[in-house]
Regions:
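Surface-exposed beta-loop interaction hotspot
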Residues: 92-138
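Acidic, serine/threonine-rich low-complexity disordered tracts
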Residues: 1-92, 133-209
Length: 209
């Protein structure tokens, strides 16, 4: 399937981060996402910068750059407390990864996406009841390929702000064995919420205020 980012717009968004332990909710930080259009080596591209600030989860910044017309990955860079931890640079042959003082190249075949671009991909898919899509992914921090499976669960009334409600698609997404849920506003193409089980009775949520 051909995936294009033409429907996306440049945005800046802030979400609160919550840890929910056995039903008890605690705010533990915030995350900022900036999406902008750039030119990389003559190609139209999208740069997504996600910054996480949390005393509990740490301070991270991930920069994902993908081709605008195909969603093919160009690069991913991960920073922890301001220090670069991982740099992945993609080419037709595969991916070259630099982690601290070590480097390696991994051959990748066929069409694949960077796992950190999935939150962009979800916003441009033709989501509807019963929709599903498998993707081949690559996670640079894990240095491994990941099978991704996207499936629409249902349409759910989502409260946005104090008195605004929208019909959002609730989307179940597997990254290998890891399951996350996303809520997508089909009109604005906005990612409203993300939820994942990270331990026994422990849920991590990113939610628009």
């Amino acid at each position: 399937m051909k995936i294009s980012a033409e429907a996306l717009v440049e945005t800046e968004d802030v979400k609160d981060i919550y840890l929910i332990e056995n039903g008890k909710e605690t705010k533990v930080g915030s995350t900022t996402e900036k999406i902008r259009f750039v030119r990389i080596n003559g190609r139209d591209a999208i740069e997504r910068v996600q910054t996480l600030n949390s005393d509990v989860l740490g301070n991270r910044k991930g920069i994902t750059i993908i081709e605008k017309t195909t969603f093919r990955p160009i690069s991913f860079t991960d920073y922890v407390n301001g220090t670069q931890q991982v740099k992945a640079e993609y080419s037709d042959e595969g991916v070259h990864i630099s982690i601290k003082d070590s480097e390696k190249s991994i051959k990748l075949n066929g069409y694949y996406v960077d796992t950190f671009s999935v939150e962009l991909i979800l916003r441009v898919l033709p989501l509807k009841s019963g929709y599903s899509l498998p993707l081949n992914g690559f996670n640079a921090t894990l240095e491994s390929e990941v099978d991704i499976h996207i499936q629409v669960v249902e349409s759910e009334l989502f409260k946005r702000g104090f008195d605004e409600f929208v019909d959002a698609w609730k989307v179940k997404t597997y990254f290998g064995e890891t399951l996350r849920y996303y809520w997508i506003d089909p009109a604005s193409k906005e990612l409203l919420k993300q939820s994942s089980m990270i331990g026994d009775g422990l849920v991590l949520e990113f939610c628009r205020g």
